[in-house]
């Protein structure tokens, strides 16, 4: 006969067994439920893929509508459509990304640009078109080209960085488009175009006076200073050039095109060569390692462009090296449009800064903060009326006659330096042939 204590033990054992069984069933049920949810999420992600974009503090996801957006046609070169205030009666497919930048669909930009009719320029990302946005403001729509050297990575970098970087000397990104295969970036409209066009655009282009060039150098320096010393983490631009310096209606400069930019997490970083020939730091070219001083080198080249109006791809550095053989060599390669309208002392001071920036040893180049202070001192000296040596005053009596003589001398010097640079290039090519 089973006693009461045995019944109690049996009851407890059965209860524990049932409890354990129920716990196991509950565990497997939860695991099955989450497994189904995960599979469902994966299926949704395959149907609506996304492009991850990372900001300094959180991930930003730019939806990719290649799989679920209504079909749209690429820009055609036909006649422009009649422009109408489409935003008054059109419900835009407009969202705001986590970075705070509005997102437009392809048809929005197509209408804003009047079917991509007015071309403002052409860059490494693709053509740039004039646009009128829903709020009536002018904008520049940069459209990713099929033969572009840049892709989704550069596009994501631009949206990510400009979503968190804001400064008066950086071009403002006001919107973007990700619609099927279309990638577009919408910027504030810069009415005076690029510094490159103003310096080399030929006849009919506005001539930049010396005061404007000095201010442009300071504006660029402020923009880079924000990237290097104000942003957290710091940002290296990696493609500073006159084509990426844009000017507004007041000739104030802003740095543009951040597709190749990198956040600085180490003192120096290794990368495949990216940038533009003529502006790239020779140390970066030889080592594949870039630092903030690589940006300083590129900025130095831009300053020399402002002084000489000689393009880096037209042997600018050869001219500079040859001119440095003479104490007043920079005077000889000064942009002819500035002769008689610039302070020689200021030109020499700015050239001195530029030469430090393009020093072959990166550690001997100044920081961007130092460059800014140097340029500010030149401007402050100008504002206090401390200019002591202008070309017009240095010529003295018979100014017009002397000016004509100086112009002739500068032209002769340009020709002579060009011949010397050509000879040096021929010798370099002969050495290359001899070694192959």
From Swiss-Prot:
Q: Compositional bias (Polar residues) at which positions?
A: 69-88
Q: Main EC class of this protein?
A: transferase
The active-site annotation reads 239 (proton acceptor)
- The UniProt transmembrane annotation reads 7-34
Residues of the region (Disordered) are: 65-88
Record keyword Cytoplasm present: no
Q: Which residues carry this modification: Phosphothreonine?
A: 276
Q: How does it sit in the membrane?
A: Single-pass membrane protein
Domain Protein kinase, by residue range, is 114-375
Which superkingdom heads the taxonomic lineage of this protein's source?
Answer: Eukaryota
Q: Which family does it belong to?
A: Belongs to the protein kinase superfamily. Ser/Thr protein kinase family.
Q: What is this protein called?
A: Calcium/calmodulin-regulated receptor-like kinase 2
According to its UniProt entry, this protein's organism is Arabidopsis thaliana
């Amino acid at each position: 006969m089973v006693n009461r204590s045995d019944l109690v033990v049996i009851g407890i054992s059965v209860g524990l067994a049932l409890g354990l069984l129920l716990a196991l069933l509950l565990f497997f049920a939860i695991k099955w439920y989450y497994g189904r949810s995960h599979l469902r999420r994966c299926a949704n992600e395959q149907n609506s893929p996304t492009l991850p974009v990372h900001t300094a503090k959180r991930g930003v996801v730019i939806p990719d509508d290649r799989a679920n957006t209504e079909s749209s046609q690429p820009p055609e070169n036909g006649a422009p459509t009649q422009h109408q205030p489409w935003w008054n009666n059109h419900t835009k497919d407009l969202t705001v990304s986590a970075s705070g930048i509005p997102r437009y669909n392809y048809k929005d930009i197509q209408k804003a640009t009047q079917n991509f009719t007015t071309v403002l320029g052409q860059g490494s990302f693709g053509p740039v078109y004039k646009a009128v946005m829903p709020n009536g403001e002018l904008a520049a729509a940069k459209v990713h080209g099929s033969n572009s050297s840049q892709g989704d990575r550069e596009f994501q970098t631009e949206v990510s960085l400009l979503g968190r970087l804001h400064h008066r000397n950086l071009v403002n990104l006001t919107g973007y488009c990700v619609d099927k295969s279309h990638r577009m970036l919408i910027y504030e409209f810069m009415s005076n175009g690029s510094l490159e066009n103003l310096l080399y655009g030929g006849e009919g282009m506005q001539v930049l006076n010396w005061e404007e060039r000095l201010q442009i150098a300071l504006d660029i320096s402020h923009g880079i200073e924000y990237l290097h010393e104000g942003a957290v983490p710091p940002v290296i631009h990696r493609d500073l050039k006159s084509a990426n310096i844009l000017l507004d209606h007041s000739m104030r400069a802003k740095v543009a095109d951040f597709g190749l930019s990198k956040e600085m997490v180490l003192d120096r970083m290794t990368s495949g060569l990216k940038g533009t020939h003529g502006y790239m730091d020779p140390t970066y070219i030889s080592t594949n390692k870039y630092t903030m001083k690589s940006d300083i080198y590129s900025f130095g080249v831009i300053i020399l462009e402002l002084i000489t109006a000689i393009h880096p791809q037209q042997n600018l550095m050869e001219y500079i090296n040859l001119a440095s053989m003479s104490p007043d060599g920079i005077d000889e390669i000064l942009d002819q449009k500035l002769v008689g309208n610039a302070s020689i002392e200021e030109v020499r001071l700015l050239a001195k800064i530029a030469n430090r920036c393009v020093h072959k040893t990166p550690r001997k180049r100044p920081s961007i903060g130092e460059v800014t202070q140097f340029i500010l001192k030149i401007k402050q000296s100008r504002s206090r009326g401390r200019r002591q040596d202008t070309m017009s005053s240095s010529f003295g009596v018979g100014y017009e006659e002397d000016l004509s003589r100086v112009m002739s001398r500068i032209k002769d010097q340009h020709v002579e330096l060009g011949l010397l640079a050509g000879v040096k290039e021929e010798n370099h090519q002969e050495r290359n042939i001899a070694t192959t």
